[in-house]
Amino acid sequence: MTLINHNKGKEQATATASYPTANYPTANYPTDSIDWLTRLIAFDTVSRHSNLALIEDVQAYCEQLGLTVDLTFNDVKNKANLFVTVPAGANADDVNHGLVLSGHTDVVPVDGQEWTSEPFTATIRGDKLYGRGACDMKGFIACALTLLPQAVKLSNAGQLRRPLHLALSFDEEVGCLGAP
């Protein structure tokens, strides 16, 4: 990944980074939201394709944090929803209620669209990051994944007052088919 100086008034920088999905999951996970977003954009999760590579990568990350992941699959088992809970710290058995961070993993197709950069490679031009799903909704997922270790730390210290849930679904772009 190319490091970029985002200071205003400096020369505009352009950087690209991609992660080959064949090498996932991996033990080397990002620690900031831009690197997470770069990683997530590299997964081609257009609604007509499987989202399993992305889901399995997030699953391995969550399990590395000591969390239990529940997956629910579509009928043909090529797409999955992911649900994970960080329990309330004071009562590790308390997984009810709390806050759900919910997002979808699929993106709309790029067919017939003119891109000035590869849509499944995060590209930073100036102070903007471009890539399919950057705003809808892999950016949100990147932020949630970046903060997940902090929630686990708070839970382990007995300081997370309510459970925190992360729910990732498939096929929102084609009628919310993956939403329970």
Across the structure, where does each feature detected by a protein language model lie?
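Acidic/His- and Gly-rich active-site-bordering loop/insert found
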Residues: 2-15, 19-20, 24-134, 153-160, ...
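Acidic/histidine-rich catalytic neighborhood of metal-dependent amide-processing enzymes
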Residues: 137-180
